């Protein structure tokens, strides 16, 4: 335990919180260009082919972003928007692709949770 005199001479330092999404640089989203679109397999005990892409961001970072939803139209050189949010069973994937923004289309025939997948309200 520090004495009062020690604390007067050198106050306690506040630990700076480390960001989970450093490539966003405190922005809500960032734009980038797909450099590679591929599938990868999740950690045990899950099994699937998860759709992901490598993205070169406008600030120079190169990150891996998850493409949510069923089916996508992304390929190399597609311009996309990414947001934060990791994928628990894919190590190293800390960003999500925003569906329905820039070159990334919304999910076809989506009826529920449409706002998360960039789908307009269907005509009644």
Curated annotation (Swiss-Prot):
Q: Which CDD domains match?
A: Ribosomal_S12
GO cellular component terms listed in the entry, alphabetical order: small ribosomal subunit
Spell out the HAMAP family in the cross-references. Answer: Ribosomal_uS12_B
The record's Gene3D superfamilies line, in alphabetical order, gives:
Nucleic acid-binding proteins (2.40.50.140)
* Protein name, entry field: Small ribosomal subunit protein uS12
Q: Which family does it belong to?
A: Belongs to the universal ribosomal protein uS12 family.
Pfam families from the UniProt entry:
Ribosom_S12_S23
Keyword vocabulary terms for this entry: Methylation, Ribonucleoprotein, Ribosomal protein, RNA-binding, rRNA-binding, tRNA-binding
The keyword Transferase belongs to this UniProt entry's keyword annotation: no
Complex and partners: Part of the 30S ribosomal subunit. Contacts proteins S8 and S17. May interact with IF1 in the 30S initiation complex.
Q: What does this protein do?
A: With S4 and S5 plays an important role in translational accuracy.
Q: Which organism is it from?
A: Serratia proteamaculans (strain 568)
């Amino acid at each position: 335990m520090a004495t009062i005199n020690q604390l007067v001479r050198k106050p306690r330092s506040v630990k700076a919180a480390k960001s989970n999404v450093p490539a966003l640089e405190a922005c809500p989203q960032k734009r980038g260009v797909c450099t590679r679109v591929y599938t990868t397999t999740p950690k045990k005990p899950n099994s699937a082919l998860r759709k992901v892409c490598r993205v070169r961001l406008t600030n120079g970072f190169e990150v891996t972003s998850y493409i949510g939803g069923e089916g996508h139209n992304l390929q190399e050189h597609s311009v996309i928007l990414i947001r934060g949010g990791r994928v628990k069973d894919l190590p190293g994937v800390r960003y999500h692709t925003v569906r329905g923004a820039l070159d990334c289309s919304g999910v076809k025939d989506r009826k529920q949770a449409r706002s998360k997948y960039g789908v307009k309200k269907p005509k009644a």
